[in-house]
């Protein structure tokens, strides 16, 4: 196990060189820990913005429920060293946002109840106050035949949909293995009606690719038309792999304009915490920021 500690913000990237997974400890404030867990050892979803795609790390071994729990144990063992008895007032955000695609992990999809119980056990083991489950997904084609309620049941979960764009040419180029956005949005709306869960849209903005303001406005109107009861938008930062030097994030001014357009259709006034935002980068020096992963040879 390699332990990469950020000199920027004390984020820690735990790299299991035997299993090929990464789990991350991130602390944005004292109130909660963000534990980023891997769902696979690589990824074959072929998302163009992802470092796994750029470095051809396409092995797709499904992380077991035990491995998920072990990853969380690793992160919280580190967290407990810092928090001590104060852990009782600290929330743990479990973010399935590291390696792989959570909704393509057969162990999670077929036995979410057991998965949830095992991770809750680890939370209790370290005496943390509560667990919040956040699942990032491109809504892959492999679960197009499934209802989200059949996967998650009545267990609490927050879906973070990596929509990126409703422009089909962009989607074919950048997220080729995602289901059509129309299908994904219907599934998410149906899931929200059944659970009253917040639906979050989170994605990066890439200059000259998905930053056209007219396209963003169109995407916003499509989302508005779905009548989601509780939504939020997180614009995460684009961190292109060095081999993608011809792509970059637009200016901060452009990013803020895009955020304003999206926020105009957002119903997050009903959300008491963790509102829409432009998400700051974390742990870049240990490859812990969005879309970044260690190379095969580390």
UniProtKB/Swiss-Prot annotation:
Q: Which cofactor does it need?
A: [4Fe-4S] cluster
Cofactor, how bound (note) = Binds 1 [4Fe-4S] cluster. The cluster is coordinated with 3 cysteines and an exchangeable S-adenosyl-L-methionine.
Name the residues that span the membrane: none
Record GO biological process = rRNA base methylation; tRNA methylation
The answer to keyword GTP-binding applying to this record is no
Q: Which residues form the Radical SAM core domain?
A: 29-272
Which domain of life does the UniProt lineage start with?
Viruses
Q: Does the keyword 4Fe-4S apply?
A: yes
Amino acids binding [4Fe-4S] cluster: 43, 47, 50
What keywords appear on the UniProt entry? 4Fe-4S, Iron, Iron-sulfur, Metal-binding, S-adenosyl-L-methionine
Protein name according to UniProt = Uncharacterized protein R756
Q: Specify the species.
A: Acanthamoeba polyphaga mimivirus
Lineage of origin: Viruses, Varidnaviria, Bamfordvirae, Nucleocytoviricota, Megaviricetes
């Amino acid at each position: 196990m390699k332990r990469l500690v950020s000199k920027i913000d004390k984020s820690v990237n735990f790299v299991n060189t035997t299993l090929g997974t990464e789990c991350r400890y991130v602390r944005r404030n004292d109130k909660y820990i963000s534990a980023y867990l891997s769902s696979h050892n690589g990824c074959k979803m072929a998302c163009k913005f992802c470092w796994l795609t750029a470095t051809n790390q396409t092995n797709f071994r499904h992380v077991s429920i035990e491995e998920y729990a072990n990853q969380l144990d690793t992160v919280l063992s580190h967290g407990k060293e810092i928090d001590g008895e104060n852990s009782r007032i600290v929330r743990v955000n479990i973010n399935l946002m590291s390696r792989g695609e959570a909704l393509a992990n057969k162990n999670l999809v077929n036995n979410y109840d057991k998965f949830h119980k095992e991770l809750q056990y680890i939370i209790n083991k370290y005496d943390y106050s509560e667990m919040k489950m956040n699942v990032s997904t491109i809504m892959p084609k492999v679960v197009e035949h499934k209802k989200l309620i059949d996967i998650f049941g009545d267990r609490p979960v927050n879906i973070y949909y990596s929509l990126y764009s409703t422009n089909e040419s962009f989607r074919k180029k950048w997220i080729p293995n995602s289901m059509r956005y129309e299908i994904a949005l219907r599934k998410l709306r149906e899931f929200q009606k059944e659970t009253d869960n917040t639906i979050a849209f989170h994605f990066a903005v890439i200059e000259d690719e998905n930053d056209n303001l007219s396209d963003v406005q169109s995407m916003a109107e499509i989302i508005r038309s779905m009548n989601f009861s509780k939504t939020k938008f997180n614009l995460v930062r684009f961190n292109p792999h060095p081999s993608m030097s011809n792509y970059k994030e637009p200016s901060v001014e452009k990013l803020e304009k895009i955020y304003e357009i999206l926020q105009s259709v957002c119903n997050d006034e009903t959300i008491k915490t963790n509102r829409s935002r432009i998400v700051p980068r974390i742990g870049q020096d240990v490859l812990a920021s969005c879309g970044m992963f260690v190379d095969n040879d580390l």
